[in-house]
């Protein structure tokens, strides 16, 4: 293969099963694994700095010759808990939405929900790190990833985007899929997929192994067990196609 395969994985807890599976697998020596926020995963794959990435779905069309290479994903069939719009006011009162810079898929999703499902027209503002403190009054904020755990009891109105998508379309949602920007051997892809699946099959073990010892693992184990749906099944493939068409 001419050196290790460069893999960019998302650094969030929902990806711990994938990371743990890859690190514990027989193909680990063949990988150069980096952990990044979703937007950086996408950038690396698009610009050729990584061969494979766990890419936000909204970025898939930007990858020249990109191929989804496994039947594993980061998805949800109902509430996901970690991709939410937070507000002190009901949706109809929201005037500005701060968009989390870490994933364009979630930003695109909240804009679609606002236009077609909620029927509101707020001002959209791309936020910078630390923007969570600016969520007040008629300014709402889209927060994704592990930072959302700390906000789930702090705001009067919380709109879980995967749940809202399900209410609107009747479909699950796919936040990220494994994409390669170049051909890879069948034997490598088979080993890669098997490693991901092993991690998902042992996801509570993965969370325990990767969390800091001082953190109670139980809530996070429940999260990966109940809120994240890892199979890229037919319903999720349909959801991906619909999302990319809208």
Show which residues each predicted segment covers.
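Secondary-structure end/capping motifs
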Residues: 184-246
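A conserved helix-loop-strand patch within extracytoplasmic ligand-binding domains
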Residues: 72-131, 161-166
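Beta->alpha turn/N-cap motifs
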Residues: 13-14, 37-38, 49-61, 72, ...
């Amino acid at each position: 293969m001419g050196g290790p395969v460069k893999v960019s994985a998302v650094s969030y807890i929902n990806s711990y099963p994938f990371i743990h599976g890859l690190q514990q697998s027989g193909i680990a020596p063949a990988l150069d694994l980096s952990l990044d926020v979703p937007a950086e995963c996408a950038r690396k794959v698009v610009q050729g700095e990584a061969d494979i990435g766990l890419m936000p779905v909204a970025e898939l069309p930007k990858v020249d010759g990109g191929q989804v290479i496994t039947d594993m994903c980061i998805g949800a069939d109902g509430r996901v808990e970690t991709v939410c719009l937070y507000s002190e006011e009901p949706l109809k009162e929201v005037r500005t939405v701060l968009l989390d810079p870490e994933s364009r898929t979630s930003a695109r999703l909240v804009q679609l929900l606002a236009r077609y499902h909620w029927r509101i027209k707020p001002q959209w503002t791309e936020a910078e790190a630390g923007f969570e403190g600016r969520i007040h009054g008629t300014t709402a904020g889209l927060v994704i990833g592990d930072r959302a755990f700390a906000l789930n009891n702090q705001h009067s109105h919380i709109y879980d985007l995967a749940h809202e998508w399900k209410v609107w379309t009747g479909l699950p949602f796919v936040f990220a899929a494994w994409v390669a920007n170049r051909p890879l051997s069948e034997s490598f892809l088979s080993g890669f997929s098997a490693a991901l699946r092993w991690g998902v099959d042992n996801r509570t073990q993965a969370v325990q192994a990767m969390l800091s010892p001082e953190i109670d693992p139980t809530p996070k184990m429940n999260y990966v067990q109940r809120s994240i749906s890892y199979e890229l099944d037919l319903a999720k493939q349909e959801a991906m196609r619909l999302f990319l068409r809208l």
